[in-house]
From Swiss-Prot:
It comes from the Eukaryota. InterPro entries: Serpin_dom, Serpin_fam, Serpin_sf, Serpin_sf_1, Serpin_sf_2. It comes from Oryza sativa subsp. japonica. Residues 357-381 are annotated as: RCL. The keyword Repressor does not apply. SUPFAM superfamilies: Serpins. Belongs to the serpin family. One of its GO terms (cellular component) is extracellular space. Probable serine protease inhibitor. This is Putative serpin-Z6C. One of its GO terms (molecular function) is serine-type endopeptidase inhibitor activity. Gene3D superfamilies: 6.20.40.10, Alpha-1-antitrypsin, domain 1, Antithrombin, subunit I, domain 2, Serpins superfamily. The record marks 371-372 as: Reactive bond. Keywords: Protease inhibitor, Serine protease inhibitor.
Length: 415
């Protein structure tokens, strides 16, 4: 029953992850002139948007709830609470005895020290994602405040991400910054043997080939074969006490289209199907493999996600004098406070997948600025799974289905 409740609660996160994958892919391709690799953390972005939603009203609230897949602030808070119970609390990211994954997720609300956070907003942020309200001096020393926030992110991500706010990203007009950081480090349930990793051709979307390092295995694998694509589940090792269970706590899923140029159409299907697509296409049992190869890869992302969110219908919150975030800060005595709006949503993510397992981290920062400032099918007995062409991937927490990391690989040699 508890797992069912968590999966229902996480449906909005899953839908957001699928839709953001499509939007971020398109944005990256437009900027670079060609398709590129992608990694991001849906959970990190969902967390900060959920906290901001706790202070929104009117159409601003409606648009945020629509993107997050919730009917009301109360329902969103309940959903966030279910996810928080499935993930380690801040400070709970120590490695588990017996080799379980190390996972840590934390949120923070950094407000101008001369302003008071509304109690309802502070309590909602704390209840949903254990986000502590921390006072900093944006007004007199924004650079020092920026460094303090970056230090928090670096500590939360084991220094994989040392900076989320670049110089100039906060100013004397900054009223509040909401941050989220996540760290993951897990070894495979069945590690790959480095000695048999070999260089083979990986077929890119542009028709060219690159030589990549492919991990291989003769072990039975969790693979599901569907119309036009296959799905591979690679579980991470659980702690010793959990190894008798049939379902590992965390897994990576690889979605491999049959066609070498089939990544975009597959991602369209994933976006349209949302949480139901993942549930319906999850491998349920191990099968014997014939040829099995998957490349090592190391990816990173560093960009604003404002454009992607706007294309998902979140618009008013980014408009000065239009955004309604009146439930975030207490009004000053004068009663003529400049209103807040979101000037930027910065996101960074990194992931490395190799023979031992996966290490990944992500951070998101939402900058709330006073508007007086300028806005900135049937399974065969034996299956080949050769990921030698572009594929999509997810890292999931199994009991809730929460998507920690998502992305795709179009060239495993391009970091």
């Amino acid at each position: 029953m508890e797992s069912c409740a968590r999966r229902c609660a996480v449906s909005g996160l899953t839908a957001l992850s699928m839709r953001l994958t499509k939007q971020l892919s398109a944005a990256a391709a437009s900027k670079a002139g060609a398709a590129g690799n992608l990694v991001f953390s849906p959970l990190s972005i969902y967390s900060v948007l959920s906290v901001v939603t706790a202070g929104a009203r009117g159409r601003t609230l409606t648009e945020l709830l629509g993107a997050l897949g919730a009917e009301s602030r109360e329902k969103l808070a309940a959903n966030a609470g279910e996810m928080a119970r499935a993930l380690p609390a801040p400070g709970g990211g120590a490695a588990q005895p017996g080799g379980g994954p190390r996972v840590a997720h934390a949120c923070g609300v950094w407000h101008e020290r001369t302003r008071t956070v509304r109690p309802a907003f502070r309590d909602a942020a704390a209840a949903s994602f254990n986000a502590a309200a921390l006072a900093v001096d944006f007004l007199n020393n924004p650079e020092e405040a920026r460094k303090e926030i970056n230090s928090w992110v670096a500590a939360a991500t084991e220094n994989l991400i040392d900076t989320i706010l670049p110089p100039g990203s906060v100013s004397t007009d900054t009223g509040l910054v909401v941050t989220s950081a996540i760290y993951f480090n897990g070894q495979w349930w069945t590690p790959f043997c480095k000695e048999i990793t070999e260089k083979r051709a990986f077929h890119r979307l542009d028709g060219g080939d690159v030589e990549a390092d492919f991990m291989r295995s003769g072990e039975d694998q969790y693979i599901a074969v569907h119309d036009g694509f296959k799905v591979l589940k690679m579980p991470y090792a659980a702690c010793v006490s959990a190894r008798t269970t049939t379902t590992p706590r965390y897994s990576m899923y690889v979605f491999l289209p049959d066609e070498r140029d089939g990544l975009w159409s597959l991602e369209d299907r994933m976006a349209a199907g949302g949480e139901g697509f993942l549930r319906e296409h999850t491998p349920e049992r191990r099968v014997e493999v014939g040829e099995f190869r998957i490349p090592r890869f190391k990816l990173s992302f560093d960009d604003s996600v404002v454009g992607a969110l706007q294309r998902l219908g979140v618009r008013d919150v980014f408009k000065p004098f239009v955004a309604d975030l009146a439930d975030v800060l207490e009004a000053e005595n004068s009663g003529d406070d400049p209103p807040l709006f979101v000037s930027d949503v910065k996101h960074k993510a990194v992931i490395e997948v190799n023979e031992e397992g996966t290490e990944a981290a992500a951070a998101t920062a939402v900058c709330l600025t006073f508007a007086s400032a300028a806005p900135s099918s049937r399974r065969p007995a034996r299956v080949d799974f050769v990921a030698d062409h572009p594929f999509a991937f997810l890292v999931l927490e199994e009991s809730s289905g929460a998507v920690l990391f998502a992305g795709h690989v179009v060239d495993p040699t391009d970091e």
